[in-house]
């Protein structure tokens, strides 16, 4: 078993322990104190695990984070704090015996720490404050950090990620069951947007398509069914001794009787039709009348879906809750000598039967509540004249009955209700009868259309209730996104130390390359590929769709990141125009000497983004033009990409060392694009060797600024004489 597998096993066991620990918060403290020795023993184990693993996992996340290690950091810290809090609360309860104070302390009811104000500082000192209070806020902040990833210093980025992890520790706690107040189910995340991009938009805007969509990524919905029907399991676990105590056996028997389902009677005409159709299969010779019967039976079943039988009523819900509560009290009397008073029991008397419909019950599965709410809605709809009209015998039922009659008694004359074209043509035209028939058909059409719309609304609300009422656990998307962002900042931080050489190029070298490139033009056919390179360099670590197994173009990755970060449309237009590029260097060669990735004097985030786009454009197009002019194959790579850095221009996004280049003597950092290109050109010249006779010295003349002087300009009237070599 390798280290990762061992960590997964440890995480799984910690999750089991965390769930038990979370349940203890809601239990009667008297029951917890009755087994205090076991609580202390498990608490010591948790403290030992925290002291053994926490610091190591924290350091691991600052070197190479993963979703698992980030989650482990959150889980260990939360369990450690929860054990200390429970221990202190139990010590206080032994003194004052006040359950209300105990639960207020354990559940932190008098204070809310699930809010955080983060001060974000960009490269040039531009600061702004972001308020976080839900998982949606955290996910949105991570998306925005992804959008301005290049403008954040790595130390600042890691510090922000550390604060987010601390907030997740408070918000998630020791248990991964999500608190209802910690997320908004109607607010979507980047994964929701990614899923929508896989289907055609049919001309609808992104906001319209996201409207009404429920996010199942930040919190994942877990369906629980038939919790109330587990009475057989409970009966087996209780044992014979407990079942014979008091009224426990009779209560168990009553619970069994509540949810006995009665099979709803199927429509008689459909049942008869199915019995007839069972005689035929794919090898039988099927008469036309049987085919018609099969088709009408199908449509009849479809139409009957509007009548929905709900297998639970409000009375059954309340009866189930009351009986389970009585069973719990009787078992508590047998085991502990008194009725348990847990957190839920303290507020039990404050709820009416109708209010329990919205609050729910720990003894009834959420799916039952959802069925009940939906059933009450449909029952209210049944009282309307529209539904009553639909419940009447329709033409499909009449057709089925007619066909069955023909099959059973083929000698009988045709049923008057069947369609007979010849008779219709011969019959006298009855205008009044036709009007009534058309009117009935119109009412039927309107009724079905209206009902379908009402049912669609009910289904939509049912989805919302299902998300709200059902158990939700924290998804792994937050931890995955956080680990990707952290790894990007970690790789950038590695090249901030002083061990990297500083370039020794001067302004002359900068000007030499720039003057060589300025008169040239970039080949027009290179622009589309260069645009993709620029999008790749600008895209944050989260928008990595261009690196997936089925990669998308880099501009699509950039579009996803911008859209979810809620970048304004005019900014996206400015980005697109900047990336389009041009073949004329005079347009994009705007960076001064040693001023690459310098944002001094810029006080606005939007202006910083535009300046960053211009920097990346100049870098990309300058390297491409340099390759074209000098016949080189230089490539630009990001520091957070898994590629060979040797011989490539490395973009770090760091203000102090935005560019790196590996030469024979090691890695060198640059603040100027053209000095880096000169360094590459000089390295090529030094690698060129010529066979020289022994005893004869040979050296390659270093390019000089005066090489650009024309022959007719070599006089002191234009070029100062001090620049000429003596």
UniProtKB/Swiss-Prot annotation:
Ligand binding (ATP): 626-633
Single GO term (MF): zinc ion binding
First and last residues of each zinc finger (C3H1-type): 189-217
Alphabetically ordered keywords of this record: ATP-binding, Host nucleus, Late protein, Metal-binding, Nucleotide-binding, Viral genome packaging, Viral release from host cell, Zinc, Zinc-finger
GO biological process: viral DNA genome packaging
Main location: host cell
Pfam families associated with the record: PRTP
Subcellular locations according to the entry: Host nucleus
GO CC terms of this entry: host cell nucleus
InterPro entries assigned to the protein according to its UniProt record, in alphabetical order: UL28/UL56
Binding partners and assembly: Associates with TRM2 and TRM3 to form the tripartite terminase complex. Interacts with portal protein.
Function comment: Component of the molecular motor that translocates viral genomic DNA in empty capsid during DNA packaging. Forms a tripartite terminase complex together with TRM2 and TRM3 in the host cytoplasm. Once the complex reaches the host nucleus, it interacts with the capsid portal vertex. This portal forms a ring in which genomic DNA is translocated into the capsid. TRM1 carries an endonuclease activity that plays an important role for the cleavage of concatemeric viral DNA into unit length genomes.
Family: Belongs to the herpesviridae TRM1 protein family.
Name by which UniProt lists this protein: Tripartite terminase subunit 1
Natural source organism: Human herpesvirus 6B (strain Z29)
Lineage: Viruses, Duplodnaviria, Heunggongvirae, Peploviricota, Herviviricetes
Gene it is expressed from: TRM1
């Amino acid at each position: 078993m390798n280290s990762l597998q061992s960590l997964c096993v440890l995480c799984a066991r910690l999750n089991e322990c965390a769930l038990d620990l979370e349940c203890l918060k809601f239990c009667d403290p008297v029951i917890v104190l009755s087994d205090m020795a076991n609580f202390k023993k498990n608490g010591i184990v948790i403290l030992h695990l925290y002291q053994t693993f926490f610091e190591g996992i924290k350091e691991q996340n600052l070197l190479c984070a993963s979703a698992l290690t980030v989650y482990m950091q959150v889980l260990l810290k939360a369990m450690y704090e929860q054990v200390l809090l429970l221990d202190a609360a139990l010590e206080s309860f032994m003194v004052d015996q006040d359950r209300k104070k105990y639960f207020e302390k354990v559940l932190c009811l008098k204070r809310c720490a699930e809010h955080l104000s983060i001060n974000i500082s960009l490269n040039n000192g531009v600061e702004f404050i972001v308020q976080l209070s839900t998982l949606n806020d955290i996910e949105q902040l991570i998306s925005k950090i992804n959008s301005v990833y290049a403008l954040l210093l790595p130390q600042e980025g890691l510090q922000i990620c550390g604060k987010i992890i601390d907030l997740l520790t408070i918000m998630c706690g020791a248990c991964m069951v999500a608190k209802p107040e910690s997320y908004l189910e109607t607010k979507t995340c980047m994964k929701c947007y990614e899923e929508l991009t896989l289907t055609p938009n049919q001309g609808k805007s992104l906001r319209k398509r996201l409207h009404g969509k429920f996010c199942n990524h930040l919190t994942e919905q877990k369906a629980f069914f038939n919790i109330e029907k587990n009475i057989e399991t409970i009966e087996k676990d209780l044992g014979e001794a407990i079942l014979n105590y008091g009224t426990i056996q009779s209560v168990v028997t009553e619970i069994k009787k509540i949810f006995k389902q009665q099979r709803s009677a199927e429509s008689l005409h459909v049942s008869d039709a199915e019995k007839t159709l069972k005689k035929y299969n794919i090898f039988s010779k099927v008469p036309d009348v049987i085919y018609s019967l099969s088709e009408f039976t199908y449509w009849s079943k479809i139409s009957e879906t509007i009548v929905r039988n709900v297998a639970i009523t409000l009375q059954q819900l309340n009866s189930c809750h009351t009986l389970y509560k009585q069973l719990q009290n009787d078992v508590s009397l047998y085991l502990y000598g008194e009725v348990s008073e847990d957190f839920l029991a303290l507020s039990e008397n404050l709820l009416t039967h109708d209010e329990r419909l919205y609050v729910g019950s720990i003894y009834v599965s959420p799916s039952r509540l959802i069925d009940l709410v939906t059933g009450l809605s449909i029952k209210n709809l049944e009282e309307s004249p529209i539904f009553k009209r639909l419940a009447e015998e329709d033409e499909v039922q009449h057709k089925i009955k007619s066909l069955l009659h023909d099959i059973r008694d083929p000698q009988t004359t045709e049923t008057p209700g069947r369609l007979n074209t010849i008779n219709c043509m011969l019959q006298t035209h009855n205008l009044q009868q036709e009007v009534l028939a058309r009117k009935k058909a119109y009412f039927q059409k309107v009724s079905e259309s209206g009902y379908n719309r009402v049912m669609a609304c009910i289904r939509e609300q049912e989805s919302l209730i299902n998300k709200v009422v059902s158990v939700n656990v924290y998804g792994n998307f937050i931890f995955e996104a956080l680990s990707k962002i952290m790894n990007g900042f970690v790789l950038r931080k590695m090249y901030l130390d002083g061990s990297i050489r500083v370039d020794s190029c001067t302004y002359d070298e900068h000007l030499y390359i720039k003057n060589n490139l300025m008169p040239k033009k970039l080949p027009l056919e290179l622009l589309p590929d260069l645009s993709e390179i620029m999008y790749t360099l600008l895209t944050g670590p989260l928008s990595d769709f261009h690196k997936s197994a089925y990669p998308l173009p880099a501009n699509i990755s950039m579009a996803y990141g911008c859209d979810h970060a809620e970048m304004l449309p005019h900014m996206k237009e400015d980005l697109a125009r900047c990336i389009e590029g041009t073949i004329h260097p005079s347009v994009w060669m705007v960076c001064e000497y040693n001023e690459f990735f310098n944002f001094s004097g810029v006080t606005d985030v939007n202006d910083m983004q535009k300046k960053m786009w211009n920097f990346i454009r100049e870098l990309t197009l300058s390297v491409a033009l340099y390759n074209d002019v000098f016949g080189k194959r230089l490539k630009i790579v990001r520091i957070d990409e898994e590629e060979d850095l040797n011989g490539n221009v490395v973009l770090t996004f760091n203000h102090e060392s935005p560019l790196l280049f590996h030469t024979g003597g090691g890695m060198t950092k640059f603040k100027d694009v053209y000095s880096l290109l000169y360094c590459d050109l000089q390295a090529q010249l030094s690698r060129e060797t010529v066979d020289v006779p022994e005893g004869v010295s040979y050296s390659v003349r270093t390019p000089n600024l005066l090489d650009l002087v024309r022959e007719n300009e070599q006089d002191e009237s234009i070029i100062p004489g001090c620049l000429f070599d003596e």
